[in-house]
Amino acid sequence: MNSKKKRRGQMSEAFCTAMFLSLSGGLQDVYTYLFRGKVFANAQTGNIVLMAVHAFAGEWGRVLHYLVPLCFFALGVFAAELMHQKLQNLQRLHWRQLVVLCEIAMLFVVGFFPQEWNLMANALVSFACAMQVQTFRKVNGYAFASTMCIGNMRSGMDSLCSWVLNRNPAALKKSFYYWGIILLFALGAGLGSLTLDLCGAKAIWFSCLLLAVSFCLMFLKEDVEEIKEDLEALEAKH
């Protein structure tokens, strides 16, 4: 038996983890837009545009409707990076898993909020989305975003163009990764719209379930490596 160790990437960057993160990201965005007052949880460019429109119309109450989620999104990025810097040497849990646990907790609480609390609900969902986009920035070594599509679309088309010009199989594979993530995001949004019809405010809990799967998947690499080390130790004795 060959005991040579193979180099493995982080499970937090594996496509299967990104798959559930992207499904969750699409669901979060449709949840706040359709159920929480036409606010985007992830697409802050859209929120800035709508905020500017209402500001120039003198509708200051509506400005606040978009400004608060924007501010909480910024705070979410700050919080995720702070956790990265302070908790990156943890042994039992990866710091990214702690971020996912924080996301799950916040989104679970949002499921109890009535629509009169939409401002706070949107703030918490935006905070959670920002933590996710700051924490999970690569899939199989490629830069990506699990909560928005414009960067993925640009990178996907860039890689596709590279393949058309050079017939480089790696470029085509890279393009497939990006378009796969975009399709999963769209699928999450579509499924989210269906769960809203069935569950209302509690539809966000389906996002919690998807994040929980991602959390569990991040244990997988550690388990595999421990098994490999045990096998190698056994071979050494013989």
Language-model-derived ranges and their functions:
Residues 78-91, 191, 196-197:
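Helix-to-loop junctions at the C-terminal end of transmembrane segments
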Residues 14-62, 132-173:
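Small-residue-rich hydrophobic segments that form or flank transmembrane alpha-helices
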Residues 1-12:
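Short, Lys/Arg-rich, polar N-terminal cytosolic tail immediately upstream
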Residues 92-101, 121-124, 145-149:
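Cytoplasmic-side transmembrane-helix entry/capping segments in multi-pass membrane proteins
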Residues 98-105, 202-219:
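Symmetry-related core transmembrane helices of the 12-TM Major Facilitator Superfamily/SLC fold
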Residues 67-82:
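Central cavity-lining transmembrane alpha-helices of secondary-active solute carriers
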